Regions:
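Beta-propeller domains with acidic blade repeats across secreted/periplasmic ectodomains
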Residues: 1-172
Length: 172
């Protein structure tokens, strides 16, 4: 890029670990929230009263911590794919489906607590959700700190778990 500029500035956005631009939507991973800004007038600036700000999901632990909520990518099915590290989460989607994911590193109060599907999720979790905040479902868990994922045209999702342990490997 030959130039850059700020789109939005908020006191609560102090160290987002992911920014995705999907058409006129800017998706910011700022724990505890996954925020969607919609640039309604498409002028590449957030205009209060014209543009929209929505907290799509909330409940991700680890504000200002690298083992928290990471960036969104879009799969071939149009769903948002994202993950969070092992700081944990207790997140409810727009339909009321609840994810509980704890670990020794964070959110110990939900460790061992089943999510809405009856499953117990540990550590970092990879997820998908519809753009309207419904249909959130885990697609993998027990990661340390996976930063981002890529979805193939066939829907396979690849990610690389981050950090020191030998167990941190590329998964799909």
């Amino acid at each position: 890029a030959e130039s850059s500029h700020g789109f939005v500035q908020e006191i609560t956005c102090c160290s987002p670990l992911g920014i995705a631009v999907v058409d006129n939507k800017i998706i910011v991973s700022q724990p505890p929230d996954l925020i969607v800004y919609t640039d309604v007038n498409r002028n590449a600036r957030f205009d209060q009263g014209i543009d929209q700000r929505e907290v799509l999901l909330t409940g991700f632990s680890g504000a200002n911590h690298d083992h928290s909520l990471h960036s969104v990518t879009v799969g071939p099915n149009g769903q948002y794919y994202f993950n969070h590290g092992n700081k944990g989460s207790q997140v409810t989607d727009k339909e009321g489906w609840e994810l509980n994911a704890g670990s020794f590193y964070g959110m110990k109060q939900v460790s061992g607590k089943p999510s809405s599907d009856g499953q117990v999720y540990n550590g970092g979790v990879a997820l998908r959700v519809n753009p309207d905040g419904t249909g959130m479902r885990p697609i993998g868990h027990n990661f340390r700190n996976s930063y981002e994922q890529a979805a193939s045209s066939l829907g396979d999702v690849f990610q690389n778990d981050n950090d020191d342990p030998q167990a941190c490997r590329t998964t799909w």
